[in-house]
Design a protein with these regions (language model features):
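Conserved, structured core segments of small domains
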Residues: 1-97
């Protein structure tokens, strides 16, 4: 498996109807929960004061990450930054593979 640090900034248009925004957010929340339970979306943190998050994904390949990110309901409204991660030799944790 491969770990990726992903920052997602969400920018919904001000003109988007509230009902559409609420449905997109509900769909996103459901998919995010499923992916977390599956172990693919390993960590999810909100960035204080922003409509953004920092996440760690644990997937088999860059292609799988791309497919996963582009399947997110909010993807069309996101600016995404991806950084591949590898284990640091000085880490004292055995489970941060």
């Amino acid at each position: 498996m491969m770990l990726f640090h992903v920052r997602m900034n969400v920018n919904l248009p001000m003109t988007m109807p509230a009902e559409q925004a609420a449905q997109l957010k509900a769909d996103e929340k459901a998919l995010a929960a499923r992916l977390q339970h599956e172990g693919k979306w390993r960590h999810l943190w909100r960035i204080a004061g922003q409509y953004a998050n920092i996440s760690v994904f644990d997937v088999a390949s860059v292609d799988e990450l791309h497919t996963l990110l582009t399947s997110l309901p909010l993807f069309p409204y996101m600016q995404i930054e991806v950084m591949p991660l590898c284990r640091h030799p000085s880490s004292v944790r055995d489970n941060d593979l």
